[in-house]
Amino acid sequence: MAGGRRGGRAKRRKVCFFTSNGITHIDYKDVDLLRKFVSERGKILPRRVTGTSAKYQRKLTLAIKKSRQMALLPYVTGE
């Protein structure tokens, strides 16, 4: 079984949320949208988890960082 999967189904390819919905500009003030791409600990989720394209992952990262600087999103969640 060189390189084969053990049982189960083949993984479904993730589709970029932004290209599928026709979103070209990611606004740092749209906190509800940005929260979908941040973990419960406050960390930015990677592409392999969210399925976003490289272009939109870069835009998303900049929007989240700008939103954090403007205190719209927390840097970390308190425990």
Swiss-Prot record:
Keyword Zinc in annotation: no
InterPro entries referenced in this protein's UniProt entry, alphabetically: Ribosomal_bS18 (IPR001648), Ribosomal_bS18_CS (IPR018275), Ribosomal_bS18_sf (IPR036870)
GO MF, one example: structural constituent of ribosome
Keywords, ordered alphabetically: Ribonucleoprotein, Ribosomal protein, RNA-binding, rRNA-binding
One cellular-component annotation, GO: cytosolic small ribosomal subunit
Matches recorded under Pfam families: Ribosomal_S18
SUPFAM superfamilies with a match to the protein in the record: Ribosomal protein S18
Single biological process term from Gene Ontology: translation
NCBIfam families: S18
HAMAP family: Ribosomal_bS18
Quaternary structure, from the entry: Part of the 30S ribosomal subunit. Forms a tight heterodimer with protein bS6.
Family: Belongs to the bacterial ribosomal protein bS18 family.
Name of the molecule in the record: Small ribosomal subunit protein bS18
Source species of the chain: Bacillus pumilus (strain SAFR-032)
Classification of source organism: Bacteria, Bacillati, Bacillota, Bacilli, Bacillales
